[in-house]
From Swiss-Prot:
Glycans are attached at N70, N106, N146. Pfam families: An_peroxidase. Its cofactor is heme b. Keywords: Dioxygenase, Disulfide bond, EGF-like domain, Endoplasmic reticulum, Fatty acid biosynthesis, Fatty acid metabolism, Glycoprotein, Heme, Iron, Lipid biosynthesis, Lipid metabolism, Membrane, Metal-binding, Microsome, Oxidoreductase, Peroxidase, Prostaglandin biosynthesis, Prostaglandin metabolism, Signal. Binds 1 heme b (iron(II)-protoporphyrin IX) group per subunit. The lineage of its organism: Eukaryota, Metazoa, Chordata, Craniata, Vertebrata. One of its GO terms (cellular component) is cytoplasm. GO terms for molecular function: dioxygenase activity; heme binding; metal ion binding; peroxidase activity; prostaglandin-endoperoxide synthase activity. This is Prostaglandin G/H synthase 1. Pathway: Lipid metabolism; prostaglandin biosynthesis.
Length: 602
């Protein structure tokens, strides 16, 4: 072939190798027109459905690694990557078996390699900058710039679809009260299989309420936590006015009161902030903290007290190191140190416990310094819904020899002071929490929370559970029995929804069969982990500009962050050191070590 012929063929070959330009497609011809074609969720692999005219659509497959009318044809590298990637269930099996192998891995550089892989793979599943919100099912400047909104991972179900969940399922969703009573209400207490205790439950609730603060006035699509991450607004308040009321303005410290020789949060008489207590509770009995609802549970006020003491303790250490610093610098630097301590404890103890992994998780921001990573986070509505873990709550609360019902426990303003921090930490560390997944484990006192979440998801028109599984790289379930792993609940779900592709997001998470020896199912892990890790490592203190000793007041402050632990947090702020762990003491690994399941080891 001549050189001229080659020069003519080469451009043609290039054109053949390029993915075809998406064409505008007609909707399913079997359905009477006009039906919004995006109601069928035709675009796969994160392709974006764009409607044209009444019944035409086009899938935007840009940078998905796929092409074709519905983004289903993988590019060569995508195909190769998918072929080599292990399934989530196999990965989970590897990480939770072979204890002695992981002991070796954790002692070598392989731990950091795997940790970097975990962080990047998980975090890349979360779009940054944010994409959608409750008012905009398309990319908009408002979705990016207005931090009053929760972001959304998937756009809402189009309003003009044949059924509430798109095109599948019944014309009307099941009665939410009936759904909750049949499938979520506890028959008998099912304990968490990992030995999880209610100290873990209270830590989770206290920690997450700094960024889950849905606006009652503006609606469920809006948040009052404008920091969208770990900013400790639940300690310092979510606005400057509240913060100023809580500060002592001396040596960087927060206001406090001394009761029976111990430090506790101030009363609302001493710090004039709004706290939500029942009518009739006198102001001197209302403790003032950053989050206005923490008076609800003694467990929440317990952690508020511990973090208050930690803040003032760190202020003393910094004051000794930097006698020339003024109140403002002491306060601001201490806040950064406590943010670092929080992230350290959450990753290395809280998430470690949840995962059940033998891989020892590590908080080390430098692992991501060479990766493409955005140090900014936006809380998603789906993350907020996912994190309603009220099955953790027991039937009653045991403190010493005394058993408290919900009626006695809620808004109990004297329990914390009467027992003291040490006694409550010890008691909560010894009481089993409930299993989250698998269904039928909501105590009737908290069942209304599940009802409210489902109602909110319907108002916000969240897409079906299976669409979220696909969004996070999981295979959609093909039947209710595959979802639940048993026949009875599957039959009830079939009766209620009619189609597995019409199952709602939150019920799907709560009714999915649990992973072996796990507190919940595959979807909760595979969806929750990316949100969590992106939010934690996306914090500004983890960026190259912030992550250095000078940010934290020098080596003393930096060392506080790098050596933080749950036990230190409690025991450095109490006169005696109680039993403190996220696992009950009569469970294997109660000393904080990783649980060894010898019967199932490789």
């Amino acid at each position: 072939m001549s050189r001229r012929s080659l020069s003519l063929w080469f451009p043609l070959l290039l054109l053949l190798l390029l993915p075809p330009t998406p064409s505008v497609l007609l909707a399913d011809p079997g359905v009477p027109s006009p039906v919004n074609p995006c109601c069928y969720y035709p675009c796969q692999n994160q392709g974006v459905c764009v409607r044209f005219g009444l019944d035409n659509y086009q899938c935007d497959c840009t940078r998905t690694g796929y092409s074709g009318p519905n983004c289903t044809i993988p590019e060569i590298w995508t195909w190769l990557r998918n072929s080599l990637r292990p399934s989530p269930s196999f990965t989970h099996f590897l990480l939770t078996h072979g204890y002695w192998l992981w002991e070796f891995v954790n002692a070598t550089f392989i731990r950091e390699v795997l940790m970097r892989l975990v962080l990047t793979v998980r975090s890349n599943l979360i779009p940054s900058p944010p994409t959608y919100n409750s008012a905009h099912d398309y990319i908009s400047w408002e979705s990016f710039s207005n931090v009053s909104y929760y972001t959304r991972i998937l756009p809402s179900v189009p309003k003009d679809c044949p059924t509430p969940m798109g095109t599948k399922g019944k014309k009307q969703l099941p009665d939410v009260q009936l759904l909750a009573q049949q499938l979520l209400l506890r028959r008998e207490f099912i304990p968490a299989p990992q030995g999880t205790n209610i100290l873990f439950a209270f830590f989770a609730q206290h920690f997450t309420h700094q960024f889950f603060k849905t606006s009652g006035k503006m609606g469920p699509g809006f948040t009052k936590a404008l920091g969208h991450g770990v900013d400790l607004g639940h300690i310092y308040g979510d606005n400057l006015e509240r913060q100023y009321h809580l500060r002592l303005f001396k040596d960087g410290k927060l206001k406090y009161q001394v009761l029976d020789g111990e430090v506790y949060p101030p009363s609302v008489e001493q710090a004039s902030v709004l706290m939500r207590y029942p009518p009739g509770v006198p102001p001197e009995r209302q403790m003032a903290v950053g989050q206005e609802v923490f008076g609800l549970l003694p467990g929440l006020m317990l952690f508020s007290t511990i973090w208050l003491r930690e803040h003032n303790r760190v202020c003393d250490l910094l004051k000794e190191e930097h006698p020339t610093w003024d109140d403002e610098q002491l306060f601001q630097t201490t806040r950064l140190i406590l943010i670092g301590e929080t992230i350290k404890i959450v990753i290395e103890e809280y998430v470690q416990h949840l995962s059940g992994y033998f891989l020892q998780l590590k908080f080390d921001p430098e692992l991501l310094f060479r990766a493409q990573f955005q140090y900014r986070n936006r809380i998603a509505m789906e993350f907020n819904h996912l994190y309603h873990w009220h099955p953790l709550m027991p039937n009653s609360f045991q403190v010493g020899s005394q058993e408290y019902s919900y009626e006695q426990f809620l808004f109990n303003t004297s329990m914390l002071v009467d027992y003291g921090v040490e006694a409550l930490v010890d008691a909560f560390s010894r009481q089993r929490a409930g299993r989250i997944g698998g269904g039928r484990n909501f105590d009737y006192h908290v069942l209304h929370v599940a009802v409210d979440v489902i109602k909110e998801s319907r108002e916000m028109r969240l897409q079906p559970f299976n669409e979220y599984r696909k969004r996070f790289g999981l295979k959609p379930y093909t039947s209710f029995q595959e979802l639940t792993g048993e026949k009875e609940m599957a039959a009830e779900l079939e009766e209620l929804y009619g189609d597995i592709d019409a199952l709602e997001f939150y019920p799907g998470l709560l009714l999915e069969k649990c992973q072996p020896n796990s507190i919940f199912g595959e979807s909760m892990i595979e969806m929750g982990a990316p949100f969590s890790l992106k939010g934690l490592l996306g914090n500004p203190i983890c960026s190259p500009e912030y992550w250095k000793p000078s940010t934290f007041g020098g080596d003393v402050g930096f060392n506080l962050v790098n050596t933080a632990s749950l036990k230190k947090l409690v025991c450095l702020n109490t006169k005696t050191c109680p039993y403190v762990s996220f696992r009950v003491p009569d469970y294997p690994g109660d000393d904080g070590s990783v649980l060894v399941r010898r019967s199932t080891e490789l």
